[in-house]
Amino acid sequence: METIFDYNQIKQIIPHRQPFLLIDKVVEYEEGQRCVAIKQVSGNEPFFQGHFPEYAVMPGVLITEALAQTGAVAILNSEENKGKIALFAGIDKCRFKRQVVPGDTLTLEVEITKIKGPIGKGNAKATVDGQLACSCELTFAIQDVK
């Protein structure tokens, strides 16, 4: 897959930083509509120290956060939203179907389905080797950084 935005370019679009920046590169992008990102899950991730030391599994809330960051790239790279922030406003119909473990390549796909004013919605899914790991509907609010 061709890289559309690399790690450093992602940091120019969304405000997240280590250890909370959870996407490594963007491989598909349609401004304001769709984004596909990749997260290479390493055994060195700080969350694996406690989740769980003897059975490392990526926390589901961090998978949903990685999906939200992917959606934020789709929204915040547009000229009208540059410099703004996208905040979680809701997560619906969230399901976890497969554990994500060190060594996995997590593919994160978000399709923006609706934007009305500062509020938007998107359908999101995370897969590993084509197997569904997580799916959900995201609601977000776009606002200026104060």
Swiss-Prot record:
Gene Ontology annotations of biological process type: fatty acid biosynthetic process; lipid A biosynthetic process
Protein name per UniProt: 3-hydroxyacyl-[acyl-carrier-protein] dehydratase FabZ
Keyword terms: Cytoplasm, Lipid A biosynthesis, Lipid biosynthesis, Lipid metabolism, Lyase
Enzyme class: lyase
Source organism (scientific name): Staphylococcus aureus (strain NCTC 8325 / PS 47)
Disulfide bonds: none
Lineage top rank: taxon: Bacteria
UniProt family annotation: Belongs to the thioester dehydratase family. FabZ subfamily.
The keyword Cytoplasm belongs to this UniProt entry's keyword annotation: yes
GO MF annotation: an example: (3R)-hydroxyacyl-[acyl-carrier-protein] dehydratase activity
Reactions performed catalytically: a (3R)-hydroxyacyl-[ACP] = a (2E)-enoyl-[ACP] + H2O
Cellular-component GO terms for this entry: cytoplasm; membrane
Record's subcellular location: Cytoplasm
Reported function: Involved in unsaturated fatty acids biosynthesis. Catalyzes the dehydration of short chain beta-hydroxyacyl-ACPs and long chain saturated and unsaturated beta-hydroxyacyl-ACPs.
EC number(s) stated in the UniProt entry for this protein: 4.2.1.59
UniProt cross-references to Pfam families, sorted A to Z: FabA
Catalytic residue list: H51
